[in-house]
Curated annotation (Swiss-Prot):
Gene Ontology biological process terms in this record: ribosomal small subunit assembly; translation
Keywords: Chloroplast, Plastid, Ribonucleoprotein, Ribosomal protein, RNA-binding, rRNA-binding
Main subcellular location: plastid
GO cellular component terms listed in the entry, alphabetical order: chloroplast; mitochondrial small ribosomal subunit
Name by which UniProt lists this protein: Small ribosomal subunit protein uS19c
Length: 92
């Protein structure tokens, strides 16, 4: 269910503050964050944001196609490892 149009999109305050400071300074450094629920805004385009997946920070380059999505959509938290196929020699 999408967020109500009466409300503005959710962005963590500390993340928005860092982006605004870096826009004023003209820097494009990597920003680390744990806020997976923050919405990507047009002011974030061109930045690299490292989002925490539970183990490490995964960098995401923000482009215009990602605007409106959440940061957590692009970083997987679960790692599926394929099942080991049974070796025929060990079954004998």
């Amino acid at each position: 269910m999408p967020r109500s149009l009466k409300k503005s999109p959710f962005v963590a305050y500390h993340l928005l503050k860092k982006i605004n400071q870096m826009n004023k300074a003209g820097k494009k450094d990597t920003i680390t964050t744990w806020s997976r629920s923050s919405t990507i805004l047009p002011s974030m385009i061109g930045f690299t944001i490292a989002v925490y997946n539970g183990k490490q920070h995964v960098p995401i380059f923000i482009s215009d196609q990602l605007v409106g999505h959440k940061l957590g959509e692009f970083v997987s938290t679960r790692n599926f490892r394929t099942h080991i196929k049974a070796d025929r020699k060990t079954k004998r």
